[in-house]
Amino acid sequence: MNTAQSKLHEAAMRIFAERGATQLNVSELAQAAGVARGTVYNNLKAPETLFEEVAANLADEMHRRISASSAGIDDPAARLSVGLRLFVRRAHEEPHWGRFIVRFAYSNMALQGVWAGPPAMDLQHGVATGRYAFEPGKFVSLLAVIGGSCLSAMFLVLEGHKTWREAGSDAVEFALRGLGLSPEEAAAIANTELPPLSR
């Protein structure tokens, strides 16, 4: 993605998050991005598909960045802790990004895929290695509960009810306890130092 496309995607994400709508017009996008209308036409395939492009790029980007940030961490519980807390911290650092995720995570297929990447793989690995104790038939429900916990933590941060550290650690602790870890171990893993989100 070139610089102009990145700028347009960023502006579109802000507009979508603020309005809650999945459509926008070229003029408002150009104004929000601080570019000419011609720049929009020259850098986007089809403005009417911009929402889907932004959502898909966002999901792919977070998968890549979280995977890089948790490289070298073998324990599935520690990887889950890092991944969930990175989502919550990023919502604090980039509120428009967080609002976009919270607003559209359940209604957009590309964003639903956020939970199908590293979080799902870490859950499967945890089951396969005996780290987690839950029935395999409940995998999809468990993934939904963990995703919902993450979104709720992001919401608490965006609304100013909790700090990102508190909300992220609480969500991880509850998720790990639900996966069968002891309260003490879940709390310890949920409060480990968080690595930076890779670029």
What feature does the model see in each segment?
Residues 33-44:
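Short hydrophobic/aromatic patch on the recognition helix
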Residues 63, 82, 105-151, 155:
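Amphipathic alpha-helical packing segments from all-alpha helical-bundle domains
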Residues 86-110, 116, 120-127, 187-194:
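Amphipathic alpha-helical segments used for helix-helix packing
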Residues 4, 47, 54, 58, ...:
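Hydrophobic/aromatic residues within well-ordered alpha-helical segments
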Residues 53, 64-97, 107, 168:
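Hydrophobic alpha-helical connector segments
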Residues 21-22, 45, 132-133, 162:
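Conserved hydrophobic residue
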Residues 121-129, 159-199:
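C-terminal peripheral helix-coil segments that are non-catalytic and often amphipathic
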